[in-house]
């Protein structure tokens, strides 16, 4: 039995409304796949079979401009692999697939599952292909420190060699970007960040937005190369302004804020490190589209105490750095990612507007 997991959608254009009821991938042999699209019309599809090394499937389909064009990348996991992980870490002794219920959780970098077995529920994280970017030993250290300080929820297993993490399943509410429009929820998020930044925690250095763009930019790509040059200008300007050193989370998209027992916590500390708290706030604003609402943006800046001209300048420069960081990261994962290209284009334009 296989679990087919959507990893990314590179491109989607809907010309007319259409309903895709489901996509079923069937295996006849390990290297042969077919796709059945159950919808109003049938479109031709091609599938690149996964290699044993990557175990990835690329599905491409087009409707000759009449309905929908998409490119989908899917990861393939055997159910038996999930079970093997649970056996290896002594979470369960059951080898019977019928005893397991496994469902996918939405994620960006990693693949995560809710796994039910032995009348218990767990969350299993299987890391993505990013060993060159994330130091799992540092992530474990920083997660443990954050847990001790009451900033996150506990885990059962964290293997720093593989990046596999297993936690008990908690009945939580996961923030959406729209939740930051709610003043109470927004301030709860700010409070947990302030608690982190004002703590005496010392994180191990792991992921630095001041350097990562240099490592992941594909200089053969013109927009990535230009974004890299903008990154150097940003770092030069920030060094002139002054960079502080605080424990930071550094990946503040909405899904990393959760509510549990009426308290707000942060999860997923894989990019955490010592850094400047302005990057955390700038990253939070950009990843959750605060710039779409000028009133919300101004209110939120006042709430985090950023109001002076020099403070706003530093904040906005860190916002550009956030765009470059995650724009390049999106293109590293998927070279045709439209959001990544938009983020880099915006960062380049803002840099020119500021004459950095």
Report residues per predicted region.
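Amphipathic, Lys/Arg-enriched alpha-helical patches that create a basic surface
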Residues: 344-356
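All-alpha amphipathic helical-bundle segments outside canonical DNA-binding/catalytic cores
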Residues: 309-319
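Low-acidity, Ser/Thr- and Arg-rich intrinsically disordered low-complexity segments
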Residues: 2, 6, 16, 22, ...
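An alpha-helical support segment within catalytic cores of ATP-dependent transferases
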Residues: 77-96, 201-250, 254-260, 351
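Active-site activation/catalytic loop segments of kinase-like enzymes and analogous catalytic loops
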Residues: 279-307, 320-338, 345-348
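ATP-binding pocket architecture of kinase catalytic cores
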Residues: 103-204
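Conserved N-terminal boundary motif of the eukaryotic protein kinase catalytic domain
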Residues: 96-103
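Active-site acidic catalytic loop and adjacent metal/ATP-binding pocket
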Residues: 106-119, 123-124, 235-279
